[in-house]
Amino acid sequence: MLSPERLALPDYEYLAQRHVLTYMEDAVCQLLENREDISQYGIARFFTEYFNSVCQGTHILFREFSFVQATPHNRVSFLRAFWRCFRTVGKNGDLLTMKEYHCLLQLLCPDFPLELTQKAARIVLMDDAMDCLMSFSDFLFAFQIQFYYSEFLDSVAAIYENLLSGKNPNTVIVPTSSSGQHRQRPALGEAGMLEGVEASLFYQCLENLCDRHKYSCPPPALVKEALSNVQRLTFYGFLMALSKHHGINQALGALPDKGDLMHDPAMDEELERLLAQVPGLVNSVTASPEASCLPSRTPPRVGSPWRPLHHSRKVDGESDGSTEETDESET
């Protein structure tokens, strides 16, 4: 049944809001590229299974990064897939480096950019070296904020730099790839980085940014709540506050609450069913549980992003940012 919000929108606005044209274009491109294979079971079936995979969130698996980040739904689907595929890392209490987490991301998206992984790791590690170990929950919640709100955070980084240098915070921000957090970190590492900026003024700038930003932004009321207990803050302190805010995680809707991060009964049941179908595999996995968690050092090369959808596997995908949690195993 259609929701009241859907009925209140004109058709063209609803189609734009849901990025339907993006998925139609992608479906047609895949249809044309694989028409010989698809002709064996029919075009209607292909479109049915394609849009079923979009609804289930499996359509982003093994796709190019430009498609993975193309829509908010794609980003949520990728976050959920990453969590569901690799939460065993957290259950086993394994600690991995930034490069190892990047290898895991490349298993789902072969051309996933290293820069995004580095930015997410910096939220957790702060001033620590980039080769330090991180818990799965720490990295996951930081990665969620950095990946989903990537364009917004680039603009926030430029605003923070202007405030820190005393420039007019109302200047129109046009962020570029060279002005984001990764390049900005050394420039903000002086005394000003330690002192930060006034939280109330920073929030006013963010509120104005959210009003005019065409990309996804955290709900302003939740951002205000996250900053309510501080008078001054640093840029990475702000990112850490976002990553561990319960309400922002709920509003984004990709990951479960912190206490439920390692629990996914439906996925466990599906994995047990699949493992039971492979002779000899269950015993080997039981004997060496950590083997399934090790990241591949060489990401797979995918010749074509399309996979016959009726044969595709069904896969969907904590952070307090503290040094204590990063340095010890999950329970």
From Swiss-Prot:
<keyword id="KW-0493">Microtubule</keyword>
<feature type="region of interest" description="Disordered">
    <location>
        <begin position="288"/>
        <end position="331"/>
    </location>
</feature>
<dbReference type="InterPro" id="IPR038968">
    <property type="entry name" value="CSTPP1"/>
</dbReference>
<comment type="subunit">
    <text>Interacts with PCM1. Interacts with TTLL1, TPGS1, TPGS2 and LRRC49; the interactions link CSTPP1 to the complex TPGC. Binds to alpha-tubulin.</text>
</comment>
<keyword id="KW-0963">Cytoplasm</keyword>
<feature type="modified residue" description="Phosphoserine">
    <location>
        <position position="319"/>
    </location>
</feature>
<keyword id="KW-0206">Cytoskeleton</keyword>
<dbReference type="GO" id="GO:0005737">
    <property type="term" value="C:cytoplasm"/>
</dbReference>
<feature type="region of interest" description="Required for interaction with TPGS2">
    <location>
        <begin position="112"/>
        <end position="331"/>
    </location>
</feature>
<dbReference type="GO" id="GO:0034451">
    <property type="term" value="C:centriolar satellite"/>
</dbReference>
<keyword id="KW-0597">Phosphoprotein</keyword>
<comment type="similarity">
    <text>Belongs to the CSTPP1 family.</text>
</comment>
<feature type="region of interest" description="Required for interaction with PCM1">
    <location>
        <begin position="1"/>
        <end position="111"/>
    </location>
</feature>
<comment type="function">
    <text>Regulator of the tubulin polyglutamylase complex (TPGC) that controls cytoskeletal organization, nuclear shape, and cilium disassembly by balancing microtubule and actin assembly. Regulates the assembly and stability of the TPGC and thereby modulates polyglutamylation of the microtubule, which antagonizes MAP4 binding.</text>
</comment>
<protein>
    <recommendedName>
        <fullName>Centriolar satellite-associated tubulin polyglutamylase complex regulator 1</fullName>
    </recommendedName>
</protein>
<feature type="compositionally biased region" description="Acidic residues">
    <location>
        <begin position="318"/>
        <end position="331"/>
    </location>
</feature>
<dbReference type="GO" id="GO:0005874">
    <property type="term" value="C:microtubule"/>
</dbReference>
<feature type="region of interest" description="Required for interaction with TPGS1, LRRC49, and TTLL1">
    <location>
        <begin position="1"/>
        <end position="225"/>
    </location>
</feature>
